Amino acid sequence: MRRINLKYWLWKVSIFYRSMVTRATKYIPKILLRIDNAHDLLEKIDSSAFLAVWFVHPLNGQLNRQLTMSNIALIYMPEIVIETGTYVGSSTPYLASLASNQMITIESQQKFLAQAKKHFIHLGLFAEKISIIHGDSSVEINKVLSQIPQENKILFYLDAHWDSVLPLKEELELITNRGGSFIVAIDDFQIPDDSSFGYDHYDGEAINLGLIPNTFKGELWLPNHSADFESGARKGTAYLFSELALSEIEVSKVFGIRHYRNWS
């Protein structure tokens, strides 16, 4: 009797499921954008109705990205996690679980924040762990950083780019100029040597290496797998490790990423 490789078949089933879910749901955001009151509609629909839709799952529904972020948090143990681009709060509860002290999330659209707060209440999250800030992330993040002790380790998840707004360059400049120990994960990033991952661009400007400031000192790490092994939106992710963070952890032990280049 031929032996069945259980791991292989479980992998095949998971790939099939991811493919079917992605095909069935990738058009939903486009359809919603054509509705004048799309977010009014979302408020009236129970969140459980969207369990198979990537944009209401943590980190765009990308399971390998979640594993990488969880592994980073386990090794790095950040006191504070800062998210820019709360949207409706689909990633915030997950990111809050990675912080030993406080989770701070920044959103520029009041409409999205209202929906996010409803989401947090529904989940029964305690308010003292999550601080919600309304405003331009490129402005508010500077205020937030000025109140955090320099010795605190911070994990950032930057996803505030939306429509024609791209505050990423300003966010990164503020973070790197502050210095200290930090790790930054950038969503929707163009992977320079792997075109299988999607990425975003705004007014002709792509989210790529060109937005990383010269003031950054550290290393850039990228996914060590193709988008075929990712779920959800399958967008690229960049991970920036500051020099101090590199001295505190062994990055080569982090799941799912590879060294791309040094920045100095």
Language model features with spans:
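A short alpha-helical cap/connector motif
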Residues: 2-155, 160-264
